[in-house]
């Protein structure tokens, strides 16, 4: 998968986007830039469901890079590289 970043969607995100995964070409992108490219590639706007009013990750949003939570690093400024595997979980709803 040289030159590509695999992005897998889980939970409500997968249902909303109607796809389990996409691949993005890129290297050295921040997570925020990657999310914007995902919106372009899927043709759907979803960032407002993942980010708070201060453009930080909403509580309950989980983004893993190769199994590591981005919250433990630089958050949305975390850089990804070709070959990385990204897992994206939107906040769950219910009641």
Region roles according to the model:
Residues 1-94:
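Ubiquitin-like/PB1-type beta-grasp interaction modules and other compact soluble beta-rich domains
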């Amino acid at each position: 998968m040289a030159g590509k970043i695999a992005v897998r969607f889980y939970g409500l995100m997968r249902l909303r986007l109607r796809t389990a995964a996409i691949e993005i070409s890129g290297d050295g992108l921040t997570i925020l830039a990657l999310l914007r490219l995902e919106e372009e590639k899927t043709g759907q706007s979803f960032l407002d469901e993942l980010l708070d009013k201060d453009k930080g990750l909403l509580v309950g949003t989980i983004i893993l890079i190769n199994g590591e939570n981005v919250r433990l690093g630089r958050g949305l400024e975390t850089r990804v590289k070709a070959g990385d595997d990204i897992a994206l979980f939107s906040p769950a709803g219910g009641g």
